Amino acid sequence: MLETKRLILRPFLESDASDLFEYLEKPAVNCFASMKINSLEEAKSESLKRAKNTEFYFAIVLKETGKVIGEIDAYPDRTEPGESDTPPDTFSPCWMLNEDYQKKGYAFEAAYAFFDYLFSKKGARRIYAYTEDYNFSSQHLCEKLGMRREGLFMEFVSFVKNPDGTPLYENTMQYAILKKEWDAQKAINK
């Protein structure tokens, strides 16, 4: 469990289903389209799935009310093929917030604590994130976290279909930060 001034980042519980349903009933960006939930029963099942991953998957919870307003997770990425015994040192995070709680600094607060957790407790050497070229909020968040833009992948991935059924390919930006950059940034901001 991680704690910030206004938030608690903790593993999901089955009782988080209604809050999960609230923000996954209509995902805000295409990359979350496959996570769409159609019923409270489906949300309960998804809450239980998320609850099984307690190391890298957290509910973002308002301290004041206990309401789940989003989630943040990371996918460990092995840098060398065949090193299954070696702990990963590269992570790709993903964050999603209920639209009613966006633009209030919660995403930054959660991501900052989560990045610090990955760097200080999980041995991260590098963290990288993908965001669509139209998702200016996520781009701004990456930059605020001290991540540098590393590239733009044209027509990189398709999450949804065009009206004619063909894939709608989206342009994707990659941002990243190294542990030494994170540590230097933290030292300056002390």
Q: Which stretches of residues belong to each language-model region?
A:
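Acyl-donor (CoA/ACP) binding surface of acyl/acetyltransferases
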Residues: M1-P27, C31, V61-K190
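Short linear motifs in intrinsically disordered
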Residues: L13-S15, S47-R50
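Conserved GNAT-fold acetyl-CoA-binding loop/helix
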Residues: A28-K49
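Short, intrinsically disordered/low-complexity patches at protein termini
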Residues: A43-K44, N53-F56, K161-P163, M173
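A short helix-loop-beta-strand connector motif used in the catalytic cores of GNAT acetyltransferases and
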Residues: L48-A59, G70
